[in-house]
C-alpha cells in the first residue's frame, strides 16, 4: 500500500493551505473507523480518510469501497478517484448500489456544500448550478453512521497547523453553515427517525446530529 499510495499522493495532492484543511478533517474523520467496518469513501475531502486509515494501520482492518464498483484495497484520489489499488473485487456500479441500498455499509464519509441548523445537508445544488446528487442520497439514507467532511467556510480559506494547534490565517468568504439549505440532499429528520449516527467534521470543530439539531461536541486546539 505505502509505495503506491505515497507515489500517488505526490502527484494528486496540491500542497497548499487547502491541503492542510483536508488533512485536519481527514485525520479526525478517520477516527470513526472501527475494525471490520465496510466503508464508503466519497469524493473530495473524504478521500483523505483512506490515507489516514493507511497511516494508522486501519486500512487492513476495514473494507473500503467506492461507488464506481471497487471493494477492498486503497482508493485512488484526485482526478483518478474511482479507481482502487489492490481491490479484492470489482463490480459494476449497479451491483455496487445493491450493496449500498440494502444496508451493506457500516459507515460512509461524504462531502457537503451546505449544512443548516437542523442538520440537513445540501450536496448537489451549488451557487447558480446543480451539480447532481449522484449516489449521495442512496448511500447516506441506508448507512448507520454518516460522517460529513467539509470545511467550515469556503472561497479563500487558509489554515495552518503546528504541533496540533489550528490557526485560521484567512477566513473564507462563504460560510458552509446556513439557516436553511438551498436544497435537501440529506434529511436530518429522516436520519433521526432511522436512528443513524451523524457527524459533521470540519477543520476547526465537530458537530453531532441530535433531535434538537446540531450539537457541538469538539473544538480543536487553537480555535
Predicted features by range, described:
Residues 5-88:
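N-terminal active-site beta-alpha-beta segment that forms phosphate/nucleotide-binding
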Amino acid at each position: 500500500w505505502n509505495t503506491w499510495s505515497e507515489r500517488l499522493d505526490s502527484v494528486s495532492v496540491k500542497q497548499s493551505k487547502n491541503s492542510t484543511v483536508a488533512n485536519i478533517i481527514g485525520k479526525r474523520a478517520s477516527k470513526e473507523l472501527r475494525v471490520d467496518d465496510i466503508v464508503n469513501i466519497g469524493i473530495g475531502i473524504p478521500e483523505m480518510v483512506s490515507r489516514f486509515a493507511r497511516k494508522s494501520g486501519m486500512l487492513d482492518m476495514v473494507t473500503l469501497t467506492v461507488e464506481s464498483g471497487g471493494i477492498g484495497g486503497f482508493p485512488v484520489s484526485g482526478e483518478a478517484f474511482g479507481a482502487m489499488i489492490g481491490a479484492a473485487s470489482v463490480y459494476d456500479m449497479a451491483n455496487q448500489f445493491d450493496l449500498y441500498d440494502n444496508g451493506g455499509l457500516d459507515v460512509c464519509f461524504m462531502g457537503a456544500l451546505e449544512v443548516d441548523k437542523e442538520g440537513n445537508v445540501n450536496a448537489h445544488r451549488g451557487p447558480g448550478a446543480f451539480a447532481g446528487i449522484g449516489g449521495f442520497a442512496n448511500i447516506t439514507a441506508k448507512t448507520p453512521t454518516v460522517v460529513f467532511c467539509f470545511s467550515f467556510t469556503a472561497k479563500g480559506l487558509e489554515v495552518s497547523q503546528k504541533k496540533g494547534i489550528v490557526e485560521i490565517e484567512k477566513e473564507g468568504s462563504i460560510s458552509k453553515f446556513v439557516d436553511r439549505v438551498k436544497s435537501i440532499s440529506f434529511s436530518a429528520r429522516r436520519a433521526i427517525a432511522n436512528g443513524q449516527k451523524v457527524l459533521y467534521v470540519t477543520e476547526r470543530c465537530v458537530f453531532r446530529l441530535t433531535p434538537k439539531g446540531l450539537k457541538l461536541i469538539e473544538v480543536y486546539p487553537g480555535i
